[in-house]
Structures are given as C-alpha cells and as structure tokens.
C-alpha cells in the first residue's frame, strides 16, 4: 500500500511543473490584464479572469488562484483597489512611488505578525479612547450640576441680604445722628443771612 501511494504523488508533481511552464505567474498575468484594459476606474476581477483565460492556457483552479494573487498584489502595494473589498471590486496599477512605499511596509507587518505582544498593544490603545469618552460624559454631568446649583444659590443670597439689611439700618441710624448737628448748624447760617 505504501508503494502505491508514493508513485501517485510523483505524477501530481510533474503535472504541476507542466502547468507552471504553460503560463507565467498569476501576478504577472494579472498585471498584464490591468495594463491591457487601461480603464480609469480600474479593471474588475471578472475582466481580469476573462483576459487571462483568453490569452493564457490556465487550469480549472485559475479563478481561486487569481483571487489569491489579487489579494497578495493589493497587500504588497503593486495593485491599488479602487472599489470593493478583498478580491471583489476594481483594481488598477499603483504608481511607482506608491509601489516602493508599500514594499517596505510588508516587512514591518511580518515582524508584527511574529510578535503577537505588539499586536495586543493596539487593542489596549483602542480601549483607552473608549475610556476617555466615558470621562467626557462624566464631565458633562459635572458641568450640568453647577448650572442647577446657581439657580437656588441667588435665593440663598437674597436671604443673606435680608439678614445683612438689619446692620445696614443700624449704620444708617448712626449716620443720621451726625446729620442732626449739621441741621442745627444750618439754621444759624440762615439766621446770619437775615
């Protein structure tokens, strides 16, 4: 039984090698298809598949391979997705400057994937803005509370004014006493005028 399984694996490998010689890499074929279409909005996955099937001899699993290679090209930055999400939507070639920048980014992404601790930190950072939002709500409540307090506080102030008014009357009475001698002095002046 082991002898039968070993020879079965060898022909599969030879078929795979034959397929690879029939056509170039899927990424190269996709780039050719996008360049051939030259549409401003970008070329769709369906149009890319049609172009590849018409111009190259491809196997039955070509559609799934095209999807995977499109996703790889988008993540690497060689293709830019204009519409849709994932492998669906429209794609166009990225400019030379855009291609160079994303080419450096995948290396950093690989490092992040290796260290899951770094990936956990952004999650904490995402939680912290939510915490920051909660204190803002609390601050609004605090601000509202003082607004309610000033309305009753003038009433209290009025009560205190009435209490203070009594000493004011006493001070007025004291001021009234010195004014009496002035009144006495004023009749003398009137007498002199006569």
From Swiss-Prot:
Subcellular location: Nucleus; Chromosome
Domain of life: Eukaryota
GO biological process: chromosome condensation; negative regulation of DNA recombination; nucleosome assembly
Gene Ontology molecular function: any one: double-stranded DNA binding
Keyword Kinase: no
Keyword field: Chromosome, DNA condensation, DNA-binding, Nucleus
InterPro entries registered for this protein in UniProt: H1/H5, Histone_H1/H5_H15, WH-like_DNA-bd_sf, WH_DNA-bd_sf
Function: Histones H1 are necessary for the condensation of nucleosome chains into higher-order structures. The histones H1.0 are found in cells that are in terminal stages of differentiation or that have low rates of cell division.
This protein's name: Histone H1.0-A
Organism annotation: Xenopus laevis
């Amino acid at each position: 039984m082991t002898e039968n399984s070993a020879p079965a694996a060898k022909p599969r490998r030879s078929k795979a090698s034959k397929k690879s010689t029939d056509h170039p890499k899927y990424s190269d074929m996709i780039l050719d298809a996008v360049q051939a279409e030259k549409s401003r909005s970008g070329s769709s996955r369906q149009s890319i598949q049609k172009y590849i099937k018409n111009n190259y001899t491809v196997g039955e699993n070509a559609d799934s391979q095209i999807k995977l290679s499109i996703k790889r090209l988008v993540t690497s930055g060689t293709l830019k997705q204009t519409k849709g999400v994932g492998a669906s939507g429209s794609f166009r070639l990225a400019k030379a400057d855009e291609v160079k920048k994303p080419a450096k980014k995948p290396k950093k992404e690989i490092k992040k994937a290796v260290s899951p601790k770094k990936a956990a930190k952004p999650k904490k950072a995402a939680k912290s803005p939510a915490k920051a939002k909660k204190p803002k709500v609390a601050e609004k409540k605090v601000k509202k509370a003082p607004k309610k307090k000033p309305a009753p506080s003038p009433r209290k102030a009025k009560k205190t004014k009435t209490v203070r008014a009594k000493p004011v009357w006493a001070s007025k009475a004291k001021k009234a006493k010195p004014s009496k001698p002035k009144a006495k002095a004023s009749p003398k002046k009137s007498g002199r005028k006569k």
